[in-house]
């Protein structure tokens, strides 16, 4: 029922629904050997992870040429947004960065099986050449000051960052502003009344 409810809320095509379901099955299968998501969240995977990831696409002003997902891990949000873009904006490319080799192998398997326009970089974010991304996302990766430092070298001139955050987001913004100039829009989360999505623009070091 949770699956049907989330898919209805997302209002996606049959093909997209099938790919999202396929991806969830892959996560559940691999999670037994590789710690992709917390075991306590498996039963709520459709709301806690799929919907929480998919909502990021609702905050785009235009379809990105390149979407960079940092610390992709289990593929939330990277794989989910790539699945949704496959039919809505097939020209968009996705780059998923994950330094853990086992998780990177999972991500490559998912991209291959789902036939996504996505590539996986099994490397540390700090070692990458500038990616010039239109959108950068990161979920449960680091505090905002650190996310700004990781993202800034890879943003296109008019690029945005989409960072889901929890109850401590106000203090994280204050801490980040000590070192970074930015425009911040705080957007409500569909999955948690205490959570937000931080949309950052014009990110530059002080």
UniProtKB/Swiss-Prot annotation:
It is an enzyme of class 2 (transferase). It is found in: Cytoplasm. Belongs to the methyltransferase superfamily. RNA methyltransferase RsmG family. It catalyses: guanosine(527) in 16S rRNA + S-adenosyl-L-methionine = N(7)-methylguanosine(527) in 16S rRNA + S-adenosyl-L-homocysteine. It comes from the Bacteria. Its EC number is 2.1.1.170. S-adenosyl-L-methionine binds at residues 71, 76, 125-126, 139. Keywords: Cytoplasm, Methyltransferase, rRNA processing, S-adenosyl-L-methionine, Transferase. InterPro entries: rRNA_ssu_MeTfrase_G, SAM-dependent_MTases_sf. One of its GO terms (molecular function) is rRNA (guanine-N7-)-methyltransferase activity. This is Ribosomal RNA small subunit methyltransferase G. Pfam families: GidB. Specifically methylates the N7 position of guanine in position 527 of 16S rRNA. One of its GO terms (cellular component) is cytosol. It comes from Cereibacter sphaeroides (strain ATCC 17023 / DSM 158 / JCM 6121 / CCUG 31486 / LMG 2827 / NBRC 12203 / NCIMB 8253 / ATH 2.4.1.).
């Amino acid at each position: 029922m949770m699956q049907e409810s989330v898919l209805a809320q997302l209002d996606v095509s049959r093909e997209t629904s099938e790919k999202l379901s396929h991806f969830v099955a892959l996560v559940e299968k691999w999670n037994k050997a590789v710690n992709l998501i917390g075991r306590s969240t498996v039963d709520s995977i459709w709301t806690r992870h799929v919907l929480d990831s998919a909502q990021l696409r609702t905050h785009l002003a235009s379809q990105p040429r390149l979407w960079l997902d940092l610390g992709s891990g289990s593929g939330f949000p990277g794989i989910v947004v790539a699945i949704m873009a496959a039919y809505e904006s097939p020209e968009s490319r996705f780059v998923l960065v994950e330094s853990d080799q086992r998780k990177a192998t999972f991500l490559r398997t998912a991209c291959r099986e789902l036939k996504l326009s996505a590539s996986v970089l099994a490397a540390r974010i700090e070692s990458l050449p500038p990616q010039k991304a239109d959108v950068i996302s990161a979920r449960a990766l680091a505090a905002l000051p650190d996310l700004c430092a990781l993202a800034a070298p890879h943003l296109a001139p008019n690029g945005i960052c989409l960072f889901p955050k929890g109850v401590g987001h106000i203090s994280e913004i204050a801490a980040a502003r000590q070192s970074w100039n930015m425009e911040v829009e705080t957007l409500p989360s569909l999955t948690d009344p205490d959570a937000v999505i931080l949309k950052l623009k014009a990110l530059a070091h002080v």
